[in-house]
């Protein structure tokens, strides 16, 4: 099976989100046949992660992806001002058997994660995994050695010990710089000779060639202009920093083909330009999904009656991965976000029922408005849905 994977990295420079900025970032950048989309954001405003922001990049991106990309949110996490969002086709929900996270903090001696990395591993129904790592390393042209050191301390986020990893993608604002003066680089950009700097004066290329960092990782050919630092609202270099390709996307693994790699000059909300890459990953076909939790099909329900759903749990699942913090949620039939339900209860609050000699667990929900829904069982330890009902309808009672 071939998976098409699209990856974005965007340093937001603490700028507020709006629907136009998100549309400019994503529109035209995602192939209709893409299976997974990973988005790494750096320098997200603190108000978005600790509360206070009414509109956030994460919610606005998710809304756009649901409406325009026909994608559902599979995973989301953050560390300080860094965020990772993973989206996938709805039919892939059952192929994700486990999601794991790793974090590494580098700011203030490891006290905070403003600089650092987030690793996300998707374990598939086939015996393979896909890893995404989003990093924001220390700034400054003089800090090449510290960036290399941060790579080595952050390497654990790529799950290097896991032999099941079929493909690993490492992206973010690496902050590697061009070792040249500002005016020379700007002049080369204007006369179209800036790409020659990649082979002679660019720090990430040096790190790859000299094997100082990202050993075993590769990069598609860079054919775009430096992504930092531009004047907000334009694509013009502001001349206050040496123009550099700070924002990059690397890959490692068997059966990976790079399909495209570019910056996005339509997205000008920040002093960075976002970078987007598309890949094809060849992996063995996955077996038909086998849910750990099986829901009994629900008939049409009335809003005036508490919703009662029944399900059975695989005993081996609960023995190995079950938790009192597992929860059952009511999701819209579109399942825009696998991590957030419209209503939910802890599995520990469910009660047992015996129907015709078979044992079920039952969950109950009140005040569910009319609409089309599904019930889902979310595993606290596996960080994903391990059971999903068929669509059912709730209607107003005549």
Swiss-Prot record:
* Protein localization: Cytoplasm
Q: Which GO cellular component term is one of those annotated? A: nucleus
- A Pfam family for this UniProt protein? Exo_endo_phos2
Provide any one GO MF term from the record.
inositol-1,4,5-trisphosphate 5-phosphatase activity
Q: Which GO terms describe its biological process?
A: fertilization; flagellated sperm motility; phosphatidylinositol dephosphorylation; phosphatidylinositol metabolic process; synaptic vesicle endocytosis
The organs and tissues expressing this protein are described as: Expressed in tail, cilia, dendrites, axon and male head.
Broad EC category:
hydrolase
UniProt KW keywords: Cytoplasm, Hydrolase
Function (record text): Dephosphorylates a number of phosphatidylinositols. Controls the cellular levels and subcellular distribution of phosphatidylinositol 3,5-bisphosphate and phosphatidylinositol 3,4,5-trisphosphate. Has a role in sperm activation and motility. Influences the localization of the transient receptor potential polycystin (TRPP) complex proteins lov-1 and pkd-2.
What is the protein's given name? Inositol polyphosphate 5-phosphatase
Query: What is the source species?
Result: Caenorhabditis elegans
